[in-house]
């Protein structure tokens, strides 16, 4: 979408998509890999000065573990800073050598030893040193990690946010169906604390899901007495006891509501409530109005109430009644006798003031703080004898020290918000005013002065009681406000911290030695645990996944994936329907369409196009601010929690030119409900119609016309498209193709603007604009190396090809080279095919696809796959294996593709079974027969000591060898082939560096020339003083003599000196880089233990489309190719054009993916417009006419914002160039939920001079007769998926057998047989094919003697079968014997 103001870049001028979007794009699609790249950048903070680093990532992990203090406290190891070194090998070398791409981490630590003798902490000595802490993996520019030579992605995890959550059991625990409420405090690390009600309304607590204890034990362990507990949780009613009889209640009218009194309630004048009637809210109001402050009640009214305090006889000090005991008649008598004038009771009722804590205190066996702490100790450590210190320390370490407990910034924010506090910041530990004010250490005093009167645990229990009392609501755990994203950086930080904690334990032990023995920090710290933790995480964590590299889209989608699985997450089996379902809060944050089918459905999600994570890790999505019914261009990001309070309108709401909402009622969302509101009520508006979907779903045109299930399949299947030989842009796209291709990193984009200086298949050189050159050392030349024929993770081919010519002027960001599945910088996953919807002789039954032979002929769906085959020579017990061309018992012909080192040469075309690398393995000495001994003695034959174990081409594969790599262990002599490869590689690198240097040197001389030509000379070679320098003079001069020139002009002299310094600096840098590369190439390789030599052979396999391959459109319309039909038999149009693909029309109505029909219509129009442009070009039409026609296509409808294309910016040549690119079809963009309407499609068909109905008359290819009725014909972007028949087809005659059952193995990978199962056996039984059945069950399966005999018989030419005993019967007999039942077979 372009406004008239913006100018078009070099790439955009080549081809412009006609956009049908009605809405102006307010916000550019953000960088799609930001969630990965930003997260890891923040973790490393590699480009930030040590002193400026924020408290996150590596820095935070190191700070949290250090300083490490020895047990005696006399030695400490402090953290100063860290720095990342340079990676040893670059990305390409790591991929090639199977290494991990990372940089060494060096941490500066300071060892401080204190003087033992001194009373104050006097420092004895300090030692500061850099310590190596292992390799930290580095992320590539494209958001991946290279681990052991393969690209991996760390998928972000969606997990339950730390904080406090209130929930209930949905009535499932107790038979009565009563809702049992619970609360849970979840920290980032540390023990979980649960509170839960039982069916009798007592409140219990659990720590780490262990056995439950009454909650009062926890409160008592914090230091609260019974009275304090009751005071915290209940309001108190005060009764004044009259000396003779009767009681006065201090009246709070509200507290009487709902009670039934046994006496008349009067206000001095009249009766307000009669005895036996319930007091209602109306009565309460009357009482408040009457202003009565005290109420005389009979003694019976006090009986059964619960005392809030201990009642003590003031004279004797005797305890008359303890807090939480009930008042009875005897106690009232005792109170009067002791002269107690007032008592407090708890205000409780069954309606909304439950006596929960009072009930709980009655079942609490403990009386003192220590008893309670001991009880908790017993529960946490059953079987260990508790001591006072142990119990106190364990309790303190559970929730109150940062070493063991961390709520984290997020957890504290969520906690404070949920318990209703204003401030969101706070301490990472749980705080309790009573507990910390009773302790008397420095940390406790700091916390008390900072946090004062708050108490976390009390607040949670109060909140839970409020919910149980009917005030307050439970949390929705599936709401995105309660689930947060853990990205790479955070996970890496946690793993790093775990490694450091392991190191800490070891260092503490050694620190006590350091005091006496004077060890250095390097000797104290062993980096292995850190390195091991990191290696394990990146190598084998559930969230570290082998990157899906089928095509650029699959890469981008994989990096934007959010998984609820993984460590600390859910498991497939336990996840219920609610977690997987689409939630209201997903809007704009998670894609509502794209998720896998199968067991992971809903657990793995994709990030929506505009979504991002905020500082706390919650997903947020952008909205445009609406002020008084007018939409502004101000964009604000709101998280799921924040957007709950606003009314938000949809992106396609109608507005006038000033942004005023024009509808009287606007469709909006508010608190998860869809409603209609007047414009003045609207707070925000969506930024884009495609806000709710992910990148893959946003690539499906007319998505709004597809059923959601099919849209899901369409989005998922685009990720499986194999890059075709020549990518072809989709005629009908959505306008986001360019963004995806750019952000995926498969294309080469200009870093800076300039002029193309050189181009070849492997390199592009750009001479940078003067204005963009930075610094004196910058030569102003950018060199881009292209990737050629490289294997991807999925064995598809990655290849880049240049798009520019010498002399082209490019700006920053322009596409210089296309990668796989991209066409002029746009994502192009498939091919645009001419499609007809009609049945054809049953060949498109059940979603089958009928293809024309022309498709195969033109290589439209031909793909290249690169297979890597490896041969390893190991050191065995019997001797070492050897790679050589000297292999026993192999014909000359089988070896004719190998060189003298036994390795296949590059360019060889090989078939299944051909030897690629000759290898022999020593075999054990076998007993020789006398004849063999004699032959040995005569001929000295020793070759039979080795057996052939060569690398052969696997069955079902053929191709061309495109590359061979030989890796040799250090200290083992390299063979001739290894030397050849090494020499070639060094030559290539040398040429590369020489070229780069020559280009840079040329650029420097060219710039210098422009600065000194025309200047007057003072001195120089072959020139007199006072002469003027000319271009001809410089051409005749040796380049090195330029630097001897001296002028009057100081600036020119400076330019000469600067150029000389630049060239010398580059020379030095290139020499250094070349020697580094050379030493890397010549040094031995780091191979696995026991491996002497490894040879990798790369085969390029060309796969044409054939019956059995799976294909699909973008709307979930998938099928399998059933037949490839000669062109002459295909249905053809009036002008003789045969169709490419025939699809079954019955695949559309029941599937409800109508989007494909609209795509076909619009695609036909796009192609037709291309034909019209081609006809104009062939007729040499005037440029003005061409301009007018293009204007007619692009700028017809002024109301459509996305359509305006400013053709006046194009020169005639540029216009002609673009027109040539459009002859194949004018690409269209129909954005998701904002696409082309039926009228617009008809208009386009009309403009293309095609029938507006979208149907045309087809003729039968066999007979040439017209079909009975017109057919829907048009162009659809169709994909070939990575489910190829060649990879699945498999057959075996003989092969490996299972050890136990002696039946053939199963599966292609094991070269197994076809399973002849139960139903197949029944089929043969039904046919009465007894001999065939016997053969199947014996000699073809597991009758060992029978199959050996069969082989002998066939060799002897005797085709008889003798079936014996199947091995599986013997297995059955053994199993029965294991049950102590003996079975013996009797000879019959």
Curated annotation (Swiss-Prot):
What the entry lists under CDD domains is as follows: RNA_pol_B_RPB2
Give me the reactions it catalyses: RNA(n) + a ribonucleoside 5'-triphosphate = RNA(n+1) + diphosphate
SUPFAM superfamilies in alphabetical order: beta and beta-prime subunits of DNA dependent RNA-polymerase (SSF64484)
Q: Name one Pfam family in it.
A: RNA_pol_Rpb2_2
Asked whether the UniProt record includes Nucleotidyltransferase among its keywords, one would answer yes
Membrane: present as a keyword of the record? Answer: no
For this UniProt record, the keywords arranged alphabetically read as follows: DNA-directed RNA polymerase, Nucleotidyltransferase, Transcription, Transferase
MF terms in GO: DNA binding; DNA-directed RNA polymerase activity; ribonucleoside binding
Biological processes per GO annotation = DNA-templated transcription
Q: Which GO terms describe its cellular component?
A: DNA-directed RNA polymerase complex
- What InterPro entries does this protein map onto? DNA-dir_RNA_pol_bsu_external_1, DNA-dir_RNA_pol_su2, DNA-dir_RNAP_su2_dom, DNA-dir_RNAP_su2_hyb_sf, RNA_pol_bsu_bac, RNA_pol_bsu_CS, RNA_pol_bsu_protrusion, RNA_pol_Rpb2_2
EC number in record: 2.7.7.6
Q: Which family does it belong to?
A: Belongs to the RNA polymerase beta chain family.
Function (record text): DNA-dependent RNA polymerase catalyzes the transcription of DNA into RNA using the four ribonucleoside triphosphates as substrates.
Q: How does it assemble?
A: The RNAP catalytic core consists of 2 alpha, 1 beta, 1 beta' and 1 omega subunit. When a sigma factor is associated with the core the holoenzyme is formed, which can initiate transcription.
PANTHER family with a match to the protein in the record: DNA-DIRECTED RNA POLYMERASE I SUBUNIT 2
Protein name per its UniProtKB record? DNA-directed RNA polymerase subunit beta
**Name of the gene encoding the protein in the UniProt record:** rpoB
């Amino acid at each position: 979408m372009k406004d008239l103001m913006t100018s078009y870049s070099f790439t955009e001028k080549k081809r412009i998509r006609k956009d049908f979007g009605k809405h102006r794009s307010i916000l550019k699609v953000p960088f799609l890999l930001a969630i990965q790249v930003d997260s890891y950048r923040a973790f490393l903070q590699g480009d930030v000065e040590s002193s400026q680093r924020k408290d996150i990532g590596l820095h935070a992990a190191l700070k949290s573990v250090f300083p490490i203090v020895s047990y005696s406290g006399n030695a400490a190891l402090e953290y100063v800073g860290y720095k990342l070194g340079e990676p040893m090998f670059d990305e390409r070398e790591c991929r090639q050598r199977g290494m991990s791409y990372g940089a060494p981490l060096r941490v500066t630590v300071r060892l401080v030893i204190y003087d033992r003798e001194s009373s104050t902490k006097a420092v004895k000595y300090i030692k500061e040193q850099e310590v190596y802490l292992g390799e930290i993996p580095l992320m590539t520019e494209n958001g991946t990690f290279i681990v052991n030579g393969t690209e991996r992605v760390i998928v972000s995890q969606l997990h339950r946010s730390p904080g406090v959550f209130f929930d209930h059991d949905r009535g499932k625990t107790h038979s009565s169906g009563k809702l049992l409420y619970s609360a849970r405090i979840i920290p980032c690390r540390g023990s979980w604390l649960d509170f839960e009600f039982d069916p009798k309304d007592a409140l219990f607590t659990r720590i780490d899901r262990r056995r439950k204890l009454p909650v009062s034990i926890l409160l008592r362990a914090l230091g609260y007495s019974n009275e304090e507990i009751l005071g915290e949780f209940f309001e108190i009613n005060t009764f004044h006891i009259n000396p003779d009889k009767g009681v006065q209640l201090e009246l709070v009218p509200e507290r009487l509501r709902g009670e039934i009194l046994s006496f008349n309630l009067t206000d001095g004048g009249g009766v307000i409530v009669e005895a036996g009637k319930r007091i209602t809210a109306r009565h309460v109001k009357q009482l408040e109005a009457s202003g009565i402050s005290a109420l005389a009640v009979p003694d019976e009214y006090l009986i059964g109430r619960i005392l809030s305090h201990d009642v003590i006889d003031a004279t004797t000090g005797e305890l008359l009644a303890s807090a939480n005991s009930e008042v009875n008649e005897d106690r009232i008598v005792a109170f009067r006798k002791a002269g107690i004038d007032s008592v407090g009771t708890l205000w409780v009722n069954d309606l909304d003031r439950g006596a929960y804590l009072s009930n709980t205190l009655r079942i609490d066996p403990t009386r003192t703080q220590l008893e309670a702490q001991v009880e908790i100790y017993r529960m946490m450590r059953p079987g260990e004898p508790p001591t006072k210190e142990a119990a106190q320390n364990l309790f303190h370490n559970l929730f109150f020290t940062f070493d063991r407990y961390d709520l984290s910034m997020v957890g504290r924010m969520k906690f404070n918000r949920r318990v209703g506090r204003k401030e969101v910041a706070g301490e990472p530990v749980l705080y309790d005013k009573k507990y910390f004010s009773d302790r008397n250490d420095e940390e406790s005093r700091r916390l008390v002065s900072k946090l004062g009167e708050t108490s976390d645990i009390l607040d949670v229990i109060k909140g839970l009681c409020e919910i149980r009392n009917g005030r307050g609501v439970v949390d929705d755990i599936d709401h995105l406000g309660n689930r947060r994203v853990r990205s790479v950086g955070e996970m890496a930080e946690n793993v790093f911290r775990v490694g450091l904690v392991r190191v800490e334990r070891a260092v503490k032990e050694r620190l006590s030695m350091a005091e006496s023995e004077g060890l250095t920090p390097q000797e104290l710290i062993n980096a292995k645990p850190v390195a091991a933790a990191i290696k394990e995480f990146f190598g084998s964590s559930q969230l570290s996944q082998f990157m899906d590299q089928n095509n650029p889209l699959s890469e981008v989608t994989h990096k934007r994936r959010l998984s609820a699985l993984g460590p600390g997450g859910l498991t497939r089996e336990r996840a219920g329907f609610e977690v997987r379902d689409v939630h209201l809060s997903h809007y704009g944050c998670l894609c509502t369409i794209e998720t896998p089918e199968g067991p992971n459905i809903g657990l793995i999600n994709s990030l929506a196009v505009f979504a991002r994570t905020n500082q706390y890790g919650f997903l947020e999505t952008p909205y445009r601010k609406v002020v008084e019914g007018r939409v502004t261009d101000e964009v604000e990001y709101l998280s799921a929690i924040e957007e709950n309070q606003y009314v938000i309108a949809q992106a396609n709401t109608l507005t006038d030119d000033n942004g005023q909402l024009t509808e009287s009622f606007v469709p909006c969302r508010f608190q998860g409900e869809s409603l209609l509101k007047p414009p003045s009520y609207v707070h925000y508006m969506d930024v884009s119609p495609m806000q709710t979907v992910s990148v893959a779903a946003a690539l499906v045109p007319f998505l709004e016309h597809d059923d959601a299930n099919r849209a899901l399949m369409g989005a998922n299947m685009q990720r499986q498209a194999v890059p075709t030989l020549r990518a072809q842009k989709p005629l009908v796209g959505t306008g986001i193709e360019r963004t995806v291709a750019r952000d995926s990193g498969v294309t080469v984009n200009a870093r800076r603007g300039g002029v193309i200086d050189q181009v070849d298949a492997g390199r592009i050189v750009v001479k940078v604009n003067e204005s963009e050159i930075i610094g004196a050392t910058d030569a102003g030349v950018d060199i881009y190396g292209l990737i050629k024929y490289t294997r991807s993770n999925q064995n598809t081919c990655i290849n880049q090809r240049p798009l520019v010519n010498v002399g082209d002027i490019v700006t920053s960001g322009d596409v210089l080279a296309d990668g796989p599945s991209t066409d002029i910088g746009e994502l192009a996953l498939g091919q645009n095919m001419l499609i007809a919807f009609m049945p054809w002789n049953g060949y498109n039954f059940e979603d089958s696809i009928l293809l024309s032979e022309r498709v195969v002929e033109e290589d439209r769906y031909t793909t290249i796959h690169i297979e890597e085959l490896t041969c390893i020579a190991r050191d065995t017990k019997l001797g070492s294996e050897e790679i050589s061309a000297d292999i026993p018992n192999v014909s000359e012909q089988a070896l004719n593709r190998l060189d003298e080192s036994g390795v296949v040469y590059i360019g060889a075309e090989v078939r299944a079974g051909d030897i690629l690398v000759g290898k022999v393995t020593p075999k054990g000495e076998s007993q020789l027969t006398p004849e063999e001994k004699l032959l040995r003695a005569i001929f000295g034959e020793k070759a039979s000591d080795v057996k052939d174990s060569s690398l052969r081409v696997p069955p079902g594969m053929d191709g061309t060898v495109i590359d061979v790599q030989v890796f040799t262990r250090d200290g083992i002599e390299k063979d001739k082939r290894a030397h050849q490869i090494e020499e070639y590689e060094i030559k290539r690198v040398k040429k590369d560096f020489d070229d780069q240097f020559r280009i840079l040197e040329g650029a420097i001389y060219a710039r210098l020339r422009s600065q000194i030509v025309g200047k007057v000379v003072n001195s120089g070679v072959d020139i007199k003083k006072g002469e003027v320098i000319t271009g001809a003079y410089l051409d005749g001069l040796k380049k090195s003599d330029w630097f001897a020139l001296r002028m009057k002009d100081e600036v020119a002299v400076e330019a000469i000196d600067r150029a000389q310094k630049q060239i010398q600096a580059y020379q030095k840098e290139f020499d250094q880089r070349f020697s580094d590369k050379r030493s890397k190439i010549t040094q031995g390789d780091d191979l696995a233990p026991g491996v002497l030599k490894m040879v990798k052979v790369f085969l390029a396999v060309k796969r044409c489309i054939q019956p059995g391959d799976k294909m699909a459109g973008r709307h979930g319309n998938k099928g399998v190719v059933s037949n490839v039909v000669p062109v002459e038999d295909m249905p053809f149009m009036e002008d003789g054009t045969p169709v490419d693909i025939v699809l079954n029309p019955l695949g559309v109505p029941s599937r409800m993916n109508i989007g494909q029909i609209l795509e076909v219509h619009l695609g036909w129009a796009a192609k037709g417009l291309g034909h019209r442009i081609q006809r104009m070009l062939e007729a040499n039409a005037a440029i003005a006419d061409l301009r007018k026609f293009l204007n007619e296509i692009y700028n017809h409808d002024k109301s459509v914002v996305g359509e305006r294309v400013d053709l006046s910016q194009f020169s005639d040549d540029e216009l002609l160039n673009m027109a040539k690119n459009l002859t194949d079809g004018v690409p269209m963009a129909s954005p998701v939920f904002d696409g082309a309407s039926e009228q617009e499609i008809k208009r386009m068909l009309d403009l293309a001079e095609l029938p507006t109905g979208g149907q045309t008359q087809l003729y039968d290819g066999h007979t040439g007769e017209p079909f009975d009725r017109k057919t829907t014909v048009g162009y659809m972007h169709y994909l070939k998926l990575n489910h190829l028949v060649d990879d699945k087809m498999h057959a075996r005659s003989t092969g490996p057998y299972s050890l136990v059952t002696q039946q053939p193995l199963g599966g292609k990978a094991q070269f197994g047989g076809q399973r002849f199962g139960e139903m197949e056996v029944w089929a043969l039984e039904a046919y009465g094919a007894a001999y065939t059945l016997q053969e199947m069950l014996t000699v073809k399966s597991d009758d060992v003697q029978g199959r050996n005999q069969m082989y002998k018989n066939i060799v002897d030419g005797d085709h008889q079968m003798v079936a014996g005993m199947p091995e599986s019967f013997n297995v059955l007999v053994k199993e029965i014997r294991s049950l102590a039942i003996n079975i013996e077979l009797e000879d019959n």
